Each structure stands twice: as C-alpha cells, then as structure tokens.
C-alpha cells in the first residue's frame, strides 16, 4: 500500500500539476478589463494572450461589464472581492 502511494506521488511530481480556472482577469489594483460589446474579440484576445483557452465579454456580470476568461492559468491575477483601487 505504501508503495502505491509513493509511486502515485512520484508520478504526480514528475508530470506536474497544472490547474486553470474560469474568472474575471484583473488589471493591477484589482480592476477588471472592461468591455462593452459582447460580440467583440477584445476579451478573447486579452484572455488568450495571458494563457487562457478563450474569453468573452460578460455583460452586467458581478463586476459590471468585464472580460471573463476560460481556463486561465494560476499565475495570472484574477478579480477578487473587494474594491478596485484605480489611481
């Protein structure tokens, strides 16, 4: 049993674990990338440039009209609850 756990852990480490999430991509200061046209390719471009599979403009979403990304890598900042601190 211990060997099975050890081998499973070794395979996990060797192959690496990459995760992705669906979320609003964030600019610095916790602000979303704003969009106004649901049929525009702007959000898809922003999302794919940052490593996501795709993206679209979510009209009247939780944080207003913002870019929603599908399968965004963990190293890319996402919008978290709290204020957008624009300067």
Swiss-Prot record:
A GO term, aspect molecular function: toxin activity
Homology family: Belongs to the long (4 C-C) scorpion toxin superfamily. Sodium channel inhibitor family. Alpha subfamily.
Tissue and organ distribution: Expressed by the venom gland.
GO biological process: defense response
Disulfide topology: 31-84, 35-57, 43-67, 47-69
Biological source species: Mesobuthus eupeus (Lesser Asian scorpion)
Recorded GO CC terms: extracellular region
The name this protein goes by in its record: Sodium channel neurotoxin MeuNaTxalpha-5*
Lineage, broadest ranks: Eukaryota, Metazoa, Ecdysozoa, Arthropoda, Chelicerata
């Amino acid at each position: 049993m211990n060997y099975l756990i050890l081998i499973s852990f070794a395979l996990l480490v060797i192959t690496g674990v990459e995760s992705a999430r669906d979320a609003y991509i964030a600019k610095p200061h916790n602000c979303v990338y704003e969009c106004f046209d649901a049929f525009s390719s702007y959000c898809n471009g922003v999302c794919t440039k940052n490593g996501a599979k795709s993206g679209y403009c979510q009209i009247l979403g939780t944080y207003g009209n913002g870019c929603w990304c599908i399968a965004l890598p963990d190293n890319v900042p996402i919008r978290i609850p709290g204020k957008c601190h624009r300067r």
